[in-house]
């Protein structure tokens, strides 16, 4: 596998297409998950988990930035609010070969709020603008923002428009809009993905009012048919948990959303391509479940799906030969 690291010389890449992307998801979109998803779609833009500026600047940056060359197009999502720190991290991302740097202005968790990260920054548009400008001044890699449509106490359209307008003035040209407000007190991150109502109409108003900006819609999208419908209004769509729990949805993204004439990869073909990656990971001292935990949804809707999940989530931990257990699971999806 060809790994790119922070020491890999940066080569200029074209601006990535954001027509279809998989959202940054904590504990889920690690490098193993992204390698697997890339086997299903060549065109999808993939995002890392959010990485804080502190993690990159005060720990082993290589551990957070390393990725396989096949993962491109690939964006790094940063969490932070100190412009100089974000600029330094953007430089690390550019040196490591990332295709985009994205600032998290959408995460509602208490833990990140306490560090001035995530959705709480929607109350500070001038600071977000300063952060974006610092990153743009530091790198040629595209800098984007992912945000909510508001936060409790600051949820009017006028305030959202002011936020986008100020950040646009700092040079940001692409905004990914999670079409819910974030409730910063009293709701868990999970509840913040479910309880505040989806307001696609507000995101659509942003696109009408800022026609020069790229507006990518996120939140509650579950099918490629829905993606097609939203693409009549928006420049791109981003899927989160649906893409993780039902990853085979990605297998037809290239054909349906990008017009590719490449054959659709089967589930068993994707797993056959994943096997050498698993072997290499284990030979380097890693555990099989680091990879296989991300593929449990691949059998969704098939007879034998429960057995598939059991083999890969429980039986591999007890097996003397975990690769043999993986092969058993693959057999359940042969020809599918």
UniProtKB/Swiss-Prot annotation:
Its cofactor is FMN. It comes from Pseudomonas putida (strain ATCC 47054 / DSM 6125 / CFBP 8728 / NCIMB 11950 / KT2440). GO terms for molecular function: flavin adenine dinucleotide binding; FMN binding; tRNA binding; tRNA-dihydrouridine20 synthase activity; tRNA-dihydrouridine20a synthase activity. SUPFAM superfamilies: FMN-linked oxidoreductases. Its EC number is 1.3.1.-, 1.3.1.91. FMN binds at residues 24-26, 77, 146, 178, 218-220, 240-241. Belongs to the Dus family. DusA subfamily. It comes from the Bacteria. This is tRNA-dihydrouridine(20/20a) synthase. It catalyses: 5,6-dihydrouridine(20) in tRNA + NADP(+) = uridine(20) in tRNA + NADPH + H(+); 5,6-dihydrouridine(20) in tRNA + NAD(+) = uridine(20) in tRNA + NADH + H(+); 5,6-dihydrouridine(20a) in tRNA + NADP(+) = uridine(20a) in tRNA + NADPH + H(+); 5,6-dihydrouridine(20a) in tRNA + NAD(+) = uridine(20a) in tRNA + NADH + H(+). The active site is at 107 (proton donor). Catalyzes the synthesis of 5,6-dihydrouridine (D), a modified base found in the D-loop of most tRNAs, via the reduction of the C5-C6 double bond in target uridines. Specifically modifies U20 and U20a in tRNAs. Keywords: Flavoprotein, FMN, NADP, Oxidoreductase, RNA-binding, tRNA processing, tRNA-binding. The keyword Phosphoprotein does not apply. The record marks 104, 190, 193, 306, 309 as: Interacts with tRNA. PANTHER family: FMN-LINKED OXIDOREDUCTASES SUPERFAMILY PROTEIN (PTHR42907:SF1). InterPro entries: Aldolase_TIM (IPR013785), DUS-like_FMN-bd (IPR035587), DUS_fam (IPR001269), DusA (IPR004653), tRNA_hU_synthase_CS (IPR018517). PROSITE patterns: UPF0034 (PS01136).
């Amino acid at each position: 596998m060809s790994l790119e690291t922070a020491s890999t010389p940066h080569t200029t890449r074209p601006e990535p297409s954001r027509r279809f992307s998989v959202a940054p998801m904590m504990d889920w979109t690690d490098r193993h998950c992204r390698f697997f998803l890339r086997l299903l779609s060549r065109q999808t833009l993939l995002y890392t988990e959010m990485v804080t500026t502190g993690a990159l600047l005060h720990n082993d940056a290589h551990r957070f930035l390393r990725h396989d060359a096949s993962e491109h197009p690939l964006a790094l999502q940063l969490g932070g609010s100190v412009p100089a720190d974000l600029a330094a991290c953007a430089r690390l991302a550019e040196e490591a070969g990332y295709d985009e740097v994205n600032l998290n202005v959408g995460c509602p968790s208490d833990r990140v709020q306490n560090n001035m990260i995530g959705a709480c920054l929607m109350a500070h548009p001038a600071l977000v603008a300063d952060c974006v400008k610092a990153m743009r001044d530091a790198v040629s890699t595209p800098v984007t923002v992912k945000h909510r449509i508001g936060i409790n106490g600051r949820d009017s359209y006028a305030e959202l428009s002011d936020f986008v307008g100020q950040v646009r003035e700092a040079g940001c040209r692409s905004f990914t809009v999670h079409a819910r407000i974030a409730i910063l007190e009293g709701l868990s991150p999970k509840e913040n993905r479910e309880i505040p109502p989806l307001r696609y109409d507000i995101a659509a108003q942003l696109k009408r009012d800022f026609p020069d900006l790229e507006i990518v819609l996120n939140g509650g999208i579950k099918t490629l048919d829905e993606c097609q419908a939203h693409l009549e209004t928006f420049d791109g769509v981003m899927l989160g948990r649906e893409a993780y729990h039902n990853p085979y949805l990605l297998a037809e993204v290239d054909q349906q959303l990008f017009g590719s004439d490449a054959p659709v990869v089967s589930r068993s073909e994707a797993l056959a391509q994943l096997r050498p990656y698993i072997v290499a990971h284990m030979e380097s001292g890693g555990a099989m479940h680091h990879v296989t935990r991300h593929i449990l949804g691949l059998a969704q809707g098939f007879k034998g799906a429960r057995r598939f999940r059991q083999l890969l989530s429980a039986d591999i931990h007890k097996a003397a030969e975990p690769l043999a257990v993986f092969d058993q699971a693959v057999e359940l999806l042969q020809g599918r």
